[in-house]
Amino acid sequence: YKYPNVLYTVKVSGAEMKAYMEWAAACWNQWKEGDVSISFNPQKPGYLHDHFIGLNYEVNLSKPAGERIENVTFQGKPLTDDMTLTLCVNDYRYTGLKNEGIISGEKEWESSASVRDMLVAYLAEHDPLEPAVDHNWKITGVDLQKDNPDRATLIELVNTGRLESPYSQSLNLDTYSEVLGMVDNVKVSDLDKTGTAASFVGADGAPYFRMRDLAYTFNGSKNQFNVSWADGKVAITTSTAYDGELFPLP
């Protein structure tokens, strides 16, 4: 933590608190039907992505920025606009919120130690560190279709490095065929060698190999060839005809 920030406290109304929460929730993009993941607004870098302790709340990503914060409670009661809360933030965030007109109060307290020094002291006292999750907030309004086999295929391609999942835009099942077309052809190997670069394991755990990658390997060749799978590798041998069994029709 390289910045010399200190902590401030400031009184805010419930309305100001919810405005601050909406400001932070704008870090996400609005979820669209068919999105396989959530994505992030590139105009709102990660250091603006604040979370809030002491409140329970939901972030509905099916709604546009500014309308996402729902069901906010404080100490078990709904947070109303006229409630008064004590907010603790660092001096950088306080100044930004004031400049944007999100909060209006003046600081009431300032820490004598920097955030950096407080972190060092806390970590020294809690070694090993055992972080706990508050479970005080959740994302709603999304259906990631986790049981959809097409989604499983896209996730597998991302996890194996075959397909990029942009930070600022989710892959979407409505453009599934187009997304698959983004996966580059891979030349598996030279002839008479083996390779795994173009293979992947599908959602059912079985190995798969793309026919178009095999075609790319043999582009321009008139040789006979044999293809086999052994020890997690596709073996491609030329000058011998295919000696495997015919695949059954679906």
What kind of feature is each model-predicted range?
Residues 1-180:
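Feature captures C-terminal
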Residues 177-250:
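Primary recognition of N-terminal secretory signal peptides and signal-anchoring hydrophobic helices
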